[in-house]
Design a protein with these regions (language model features):
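Phosphate/pyrophosphate-binding loops and the adjoining catalytic core of nucleotide-dependent enzymes
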Residues: 2-5, 30-31, 78-79, 337
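An alpha-helical support segment within catalytic cores of ATP-dependent transferases
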Residues: 7-23, 133, 144-207, 269-272, ...
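Conserved N-terminal boundary motif of the eukaryotic protein kinase catalytic domain
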Residues: 24-30
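Active-site activation/catalytic loop segments of kinase-like enzymes and analogous catalytic loops
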Residues: 235-271, 286-305
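ATP/Mg2+ or Mg2+-diphosphate-binding catalytic cores
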Residues: 252, 271, 291-337
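All-alpha amphipathic helical-bundle segments outside canonical DNA-binding/catalytic cores
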Residues: 272-286
Length: 337
């Protein structure tokens, strides 16, 4: 766990470097729970004019505890563009440290004090229909961001067919690289290739769009952009549907998937041929590629004595459950694609 005294000193040094005319004083730092793969810290600073501001620090964990290997510089570049363009409702990205001050690459963001959508939707008084509409609208907004804004911060992957084939190939390649045989990966790769749906235009994809990464404050605010990339919009739809089915909170997609997708199509102009329950089901498998294979790589590293941590062990359960779920999805979609 990060030492809060050294974090406070490092944050103070970082702010002093950026705010030379009047740097704030760091009043407090405390660990934030809920961060799944990053080290999260809540800080409060006081500015010379008397104003207090809450900040959130999002840092890399020690190398041996990394569950998902993602790039803080790449994430910062995406967040910086989105913040400067006010393109998506989200906590603003304010500062970046390459590790010189805080000991690890760290993004400093404004703090949104709203609850997660996952927590808010369990309230007995929650308007779940309204939440579902807001989710569809938020996702449509992300997918409508002009890719030209990124100008090198995100690299377009090329044509749709090559991109999707590349994602499909990752399943078989991961099986070959794994220390033991995982035949389900070969099966998924072959099934996905044989059942590809119609292509769509490439868009900004959040990459981990789920209820716990949406904060309820003046609508919905999207957080945790470490998997952001240019890809097929149905990746986010598929991941949201898959994740929503695996948590105890109300499933905002499954309560009325036709209405959810109709609202999304109305906001984006997508066709019913391209965006429907079958294609979302297909992409619920595709969307899991990066997360699942990262867990698999971490599991292999742990078995080889190269990694450790409670989260790595915990995530092994996700591998077994994922295999069962994806095979079930493939079976249910036979004849629909």
């Amino acid at each position: 766990m990060r030492d809060m005294d050294s974090t406070a000193r490092g944050l103070g040094d970082l702010l002093a470097r950026h705010e030379q005319a009047g740097a704030p004083k760091v009043l407090s730092c405390r660990p934030l729970t809920g961060g799944y793969s990053r080290v999260m810290t809540h800080a409060v600073v006081a500015w010379p004019d008397g104003r207090e501001q809450a900040l959130v620090l999002r840092s890399d964990p020690p190398p041996e505890e990394i569950v998902y290997k993602t790039d803080r510089v790449a994430e910062w570049n995406v967040l910086r563009v989105l913040t400067e363009a006010s393109a998506v409702a989200m906590p603003p990205a304010l500062y970046f440290d390459d590790g010189s001050h805080l000991g690890a690459p760290t993004i400093v963001l404004g703090c949104c004090d709203g609850p997660s959508l996952q927590a808010a939707s369990t309230d007995a008084a929650a308007d779940l229909d309204s939440f579902a509409e807001q989710v569809a609208d938020t996702l449509a907004g992300i997918h409508s961001v002009d890719l030209a804004l990124f100008d090198g911060a995100l690299t377009p992957p090329g044509d749709w067919e090559s991109y999707v084939n590349g994602l499909i190939d990752e399943w078989a390649l991961a099986e070959r690289a794994h220390p033991e045989s995982v035949p389900v990966l070969r099966y998924l790769s072959a099934w996905l290739r044989a059942h590809r749906p119609a292509p769509m235009d490439m868009v900004l994809v959040h990459g981990d769009f789920q209820a716990s990464n949406l904060l309820v404050k003046d609508g919905l605010q999207a957080i945790d952009w470490e998997f952001a990339h240019v890809g097929d919009p149905r990746e986010d739809l598929g991941w949201f549907s898959l994740f929503s089915a695996s948590i105890s909170a109300p499933n905002l997609y499954a309560r009325d998937p036709e209405s959810f997708l109709a609202r999304y199509r109305a906001r984006t102009g997508a066709s019913a041929e391209a965006v429907n329950q079958a294609t979302v089901g297909y992409f619920s498998v595709i969307a899991a590629t990066r997360v699942y294979l990262s867990i698999l790589q971490s599991a292999a590293a742990m078995a080889q004595g190269k990694a450790q941590g409670v989260m790595l062990t915990y995530n092994l359960n996700a591998c077994a459950l994922g295999n069962f779920n994806w095979l079930s999805i493939c079976q249910s979609l036979e004849g629909a694609l």
